[in-house]
Amino acid sequence: MSFSRTSIYLRLFSFIIPFSSSIFSGTNFPAMDIFTSSAHMSMGGAGYLKPSPLSSGINPSIHGGKVFSASIIKYPADVVSQNIGISYPFKNNTFASFSVNHISYGLFEGYDENLISTGTYNASDTKISATYGRGIFRLPIKLGVKSSLYLSNYGDHSFNTFSFSSGFSFRVDEQKITLGMSIHNLATNFSDLTVDFYPKVVISGSKSLKHLPLNIFLDLTSEDRSDVTVFIGGEFDINKNLQFRLGSSNRKSSQNIKKNTFSSIIGATGFGFGYEEKDILINYSIYMFGTGALSQSLEINIAI
């Protein structure tokens, strides 16, 4: 790629950043942003440009070849996320992926307006997603779209939601840099319940360092142009089989309840390891909240 073409891409990207940050505002439906990938959780939420058929936090134009993935994530308060996904490339520089994510919020005691017990009930969300993407001719640019159907059940209340995400990415091979932009959670609700949804704009970048076996990921997300969340994470190849990941975000301040110095420092931070043997990659991750609570995740990826 010539320097002039690289300059054009970077100028286009710098124009999109200030424009996109002013499009939307609001607070989103929590189930749309919960961790579903162990690798992304280990980087504290960074890695929108890291391929995963499981992750809810990924640019739809990104894919990682033929792979089947499954993960389980244990959150505080007995909240459990179970996820499976598959991605597959096709001819003509196209790919598709499919995933199912189930989140169980546990068992709750129900009460009527007179505070009389009505028994227990389960609360859960199930998301079914399909993604399609392709390259643009011979250019280093990829486009992708993702559609998701949410099936939510909260005792006597249930509702169905359809959401749509799209994104593009391009790679500058000489500098080993990938840049991308995506818009997530364009949603509509198919029920009598009123639920507010607000799209999220994400600006992402990743770089493979030249003299270190390290990939760095930087993501800026916004549902309100005055409130930007910054995620930064890294993936370090210790050797050909072992990986170490670490990441955090400026959510440290919002999660900081000043419980103690240690919790304030490590809040909103994730770390984890990956071990790869032949066609199998196993990831284990921990995410630490500012309250001192922990989430743990185990994930397996199988090349097919």
Please tell me what each predicted stretch does.
Residues 1-38:
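Cleavable N-terminal export/targeting peptides
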Residues 24-304:
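Subset of outer-membrane beta-barrel
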